[in-house]
UniProtKB/Swiss-Prot annotation:
Keywords: Isomerase, Pyridoxal phosphate. InterPro entries: Ala_racemase, Ala_racemase/Decarboxylase_C, Ala_racemase_C, Ala_racemase_N, Ala_racemase_pyridoxalP-BS, PLP-binding_barrel. Its cofactor is pyridoxal 5'-phosphate. This is Alanine racemase. It is an enzyme of class 5 (isomerase). Its EC number is 5.1.1.1. Catalyzes the interconversion of L-alanine and D-alanine. May also act on other amino acids. One of its GO terms (cellular component) is cytosol. The gene is alr. Substrate binds at R130, M303.
């Protein structure tokens, strides 16, 4: 077996997760969010596995064009919209929807000559204060879009939650109320719910939900696990032991002699490091799954390798598999040890890691 790390992507897990989310929001269509290379799972891999999704959400135009070139015919939505007037003919030519969240985009729509109108999702800033038009701006912007011949009718409406991943935080209710009041009586689709909205705020589900991380089997909520919602990890990040060595008590290991053994033990060296996207700041004790058990990282993660304490009586050998995260070792647990979020772990894998459908 190739000793280098690989991300094995389960098509059945992706399909299971889509079905679970449909069950959570039976009245809603699903806009599967596949930005950032399908959250590190491979853009076309994910889209081809999720052919039954009603649409796909993306961050960048090149992602949408890659899906169209790959034969994807479903609705595509640019969640950050377009950035240049020259993008607009590409949206028209490839039948790509766009979010409009800024006055510069509105002006480009008004000033560009297009062969047919573009489908627009007008983004309301209901309280996240990142992208979108404020309630005070909304009516004027909506009227201008309605008057613009380059905009298909009806105009669809959306917002994004700041704190939906905190189920006890009432700010999500405040945002929902603001959005619903502002858009009451208007035609078009409505979409509010991201993964956390779909799982924890059913009243936010609307016409479309926009799940991202949950599609990949991961909970959006710190301290929670996707399995609690019927989700299955879609990624198994796997490498192997490239060395197993006896190690004496009171001897250090790794750069900076950061860790010293308290007793005689056996160490395993795993072929993965920060050059592959595994975080350098993973602290001592971060778990790795080897031969049916958790073993702790010891010493510093280096560019190509990390070291684990296999234990004094370990029988592990060179070539044995090491799971960095996956079904047996949830990525949420690893992220909590490292002090980050699962989103960051799965999206930061570098091109050295082979991504393959398993």
């Amino acid at each position: 077996m190739n000793p280098f790390p690989r991300a094995e992507i389960s098509s059945s897990a992706l399909q299971t997760n889509l079905a679970a989310l449909r069950q959570q929001a039976p009245a809603s269509r699903v806009m599967a969010v596949v930005k950032a290379n399908g959250y590190g799972h491979g853009l076309l891999n994910v889209a081809n596995c999720l052919v039954s999704a009603d649409g796909f959400g993306l961050a960048r135009l090149d992602e949408a064009l890659e899906l169209r070139a790959g034969g994807v015919t479903a609705r595509l939505l640019l969640l950050e919209g377009f950035f240049r007037a020259t993008d607009l003919p590409l949206l028209v030519g490839h039948d790509i929807d766009t979010v409009v969240h800024h006055s510069s985009q509105l002006e480009m729509l008004e000033q560009t000559v297009l062969s047919k109108p573009v489908t627009v999702w007008l983004k309301v800033d209901s309280g996240m204060h990142r992208l979108g038009f404020t309630p005070e701006q909304f009516s004027t912007v909506y009227d201008r879009l309605m008057a613009c011949s380059n905009v298909a009718k009806p105009i669809h409406l959306m917002t994004h939650f700041a704190c939906a991943d905190e189920p006890d935080n009432t700010y999500t209710s405040v945002q929902m109320a603001a959005f619903n009041t502002l858009t009451a009586g208007l035609p078009g689709f409505r979409t509010l719910a991201n993964s956390a909205g779909a799982l924890y705020w059913p009243q936010s589900q609307g016409d479309w939900i926009r799940p991202g991380i949950a599609l990949y089997g991961v909970s959006p909520v710190t301290g929670d696990c996707g399995a609690n919602h019927g989700l299955v990890p879609a990624m198994e990040l796997v490498s192997q032991l490239i060395a197993v060595r006896d190690h004496k008590a009171n001897q250090p290991v790794g750069y900076g002699c950061f860790w010293t053994a308290k007793q005689d033990t056996r160490l395993g060296v795993v072929a993965i490091g920060y050059g592959d996207g595994y975080p350098r700041n993973a602290p001592e004790g971060t778990p790795v799954w080897v031969n049916g058990r958790r073993v702790p990282i010891v010493g510093r993660v280096s560019m190509d390798m990390l070291t684990v304490d296999l234990g004094q009586d370990a029988q592990d050998k060179v070539g044995d598999s090491a799971l960095l995260w996956g079904k047996a070792l949830p990525v949420e647990e690893v992220a909590e040890h490292i002090g980050t979020i699962a989103y960051e772990l799965v999206t930061k894998l570098t091109p050295r890691v082979a991504v393959c459908l398993a």
